[in-house]
Every structure is written in C-alpha cells, then in structure tokens.
Amino acid sequence: MSLTEIQKKELRGRGHALKPVVSIGNSGLSKAVLRELELSLEHHDLMKIKIGGAERDERKKIIEQICTTFNTELVQAIGHIALVYHKLDD
C-alpha cells in the first residue's frame, strides 16, 4: 500500500483534529502496546500514536516496526507524534 502525496495531504487534514489513540512509553513496543495497537487499528483507519521517552532514531525504528507489523502507512511524523493510516476491511 502506497499513498500519493494528494492522499497524504487529505489524511493530514483529517488527522489534525485527532488526539493520540495509543501512547508508547519508555518500555517501547511491549506486548500490551502491540495488543492495544491491534485493537485500535480494527476501529480506526487513521490514528495518532504518541511515542514518548525515545530519541529520534529510536522513534523512527518504532514507527517502522509498527508500519511493518500492522501493514500501516506513515502519513506524517512530527516530534513524538506519528499519524498512520490503515485501510479498514469492509
């Protein structure tokens, strides 16, 4: 799945008003966080994830792991907040 720049722009606009659905703390991607991400992605096609307590490179690795594990597309990452898109099954 690959989003065009036009699609990303539209998704960024939709995501602007969203609050983070999942917060990842100092422990990183624990089993509980992965389970919460999985449950959240069943109900949200677009969601913000807050990644706290990590350096820039570590945050990037966490985002890549989330995108790979859950087949999501990174729309935008600013600071500690990542906006990801996941196409919901009909």
What name fits each language-model region?
Residues M1-D90:
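Positively charged, polar, low-complexity stretches
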